[in-house]
């Protein structure tokens, strides 16, 4: 029978729980989440268990990474179900602060990064996003002091930005990217998939199929530009409104025009109805 994890909602409670976990020099892994947990999140937890003695999962819907017109108010909040899933995975500690705990009255600081990985892609369409992400992740690292932190590769640009921030600020956290977990039809698992209607859900895997087609063309010797154009046509013809479909250097996320320039990562973001989906694959 699974043992329920400790749930901390205040900083003193978190510090007490972490001190208990760290007895006998136990290593700690952090899995930052916004809740609404699915199998993709649980795969991060399982990787965390392989990389550290103790596992902490944060469940916090971070308001600073949402613009006023975005879905902060409607973002799914399912803490009871989340806690049950984490208990089944034998997570040691859940950090579930209120917004007022994370951002108390008078809070006026922000962590920003000017890393090349920030430029374009998500930053072009959600310019508020990375300032909110780096600030909350920086706070989580400082609060929890993990040895390692696990992030999903579905948010590939975020993974690169957080990795750079942790290194630049000497936070002492090894950031590990976990593989994207997909549904059987290829759709990347996401908490926002619940927004899709049945008709939209049937169309959604087109994003993944289009990226695979782009990768196939590039490997066959077609130019990156023509391959991206073909992929974009597949996406828009399926009914998406495309934000971007780009080829970037897999490490730096600099724009890339030829396979000779280095390893390629394809990244895509598009709206299907009211739902915005992102995904990426290696070439």
UniProtKB/Swiss-Prot annotation:
Location(s) in or outside the cell: Cytoplasm
Gene Ontology cellular component terms for the protein in this record: cytosol
Reactions it catalyzes: (R)-pantoate + beta-alanine + ATP = (R)-pantothenate + AMP + diphosphate + H(+)
GO molecular-function terms, A-Z: ATP binding; pantoate-beta-alanine ligase activity
Amino-acid positions noted as binding beta-alanine in the UniProt annotation, renumbered to this chain: 65
Domain of life where this protein originates: Bacteria
Catalytic residues, chain numbering: 41
Pfam families reported in the protein's UniProt record: Pantoate_ligase
Binding site for (R)-pantoate: 65, 158
Positions annotated to bind ATP: 34-41, 152-155, 181, 189-192
EC number(s) on file: 6.3.2.1
BP GO terms, sorted: pantothenate biosynthetic process
Listed pathway(s): Cofactor biosynthesis; (R)-pantothenate biosynthesis; (R)-pantothenate from (R)-pantoate and beta-alanine: step 1/1
Primary location: cytoplasm
Keyword annotations of the record: ATP-binding, Cytoplasm, Ligase, Nucleotide-binding, Pantothenate biosynthesis
Misc. comment: The reaction proceeds by a bi uni uni bi ping pong mechanism.
Similarity annotation: Belongs to the pantothenate synthetase family.
Function as written in the Swiss-Prot or TrEMBL entry: Catalyzes the condensation of pantoate with beta-alanine in an ATP-dependent reaction via a pantoyl-adenylate intermediate.
Subunit structure: Homodimer.
Protein known as: Pantothenate synthetase
Gene: panC
């Amino acid at each position: 029978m699974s043992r329920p994890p400790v749930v901390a909602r205040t900083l003193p409670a978190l510090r007490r729980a972490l001190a208990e976990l760290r007895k006998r020099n136990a290593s700690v892994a952090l899995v930052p989440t916004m809740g609404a947990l699915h199998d993709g999140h649980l795969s991060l937890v399982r990787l965390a268990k392989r990389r550290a003695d103790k596992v902490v999962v944060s469940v916090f819907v971070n308001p600073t990474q949402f613009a006023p017109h975005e879905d902060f108010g409607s973002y799914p909040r399912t803490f009871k179900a989340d806690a049950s899933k984490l208990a089944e995975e034998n997570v040691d500690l859940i950090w579930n602060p209120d917004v007022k705990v994370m951002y108390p009255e008078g809070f006026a600081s922000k962590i920003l990064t000017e890393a090349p990985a920030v430029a374009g892609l998500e930053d072009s369409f959600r310019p508020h996003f990375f300032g909110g992400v780096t600030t909350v992740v920086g706070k989580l690292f400082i609060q929890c002091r993990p040895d390692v932190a696990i992030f999903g590769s579905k948010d590939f640009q975020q993974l690169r930005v957080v990795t750079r921030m942790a290194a630049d600020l000497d936070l002492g956290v090894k950031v590990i990217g976990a593989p994207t977990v997909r549904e059987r039809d290829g759709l990347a698992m996401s908490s926002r998939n619940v927004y899709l209607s049945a008709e939209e859900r049937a169309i959604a895997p087109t994003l993944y199929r289009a990226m695979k087609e782009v990768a196939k063309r590039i490997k066959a010797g077609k130019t990156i530009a023509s391959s991206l154009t073909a992929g974009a046509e597949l996406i828009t013809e399926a009914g998406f409104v495309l934000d971007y479909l780009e080829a970037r250097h897999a490490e730096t996320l600099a724009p890339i025009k030829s396979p000779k320039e280095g390893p390629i990562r394809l990244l895509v973001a598009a709206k299907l109805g009211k739902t915005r989906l992102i995904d990426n694959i290696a070439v």
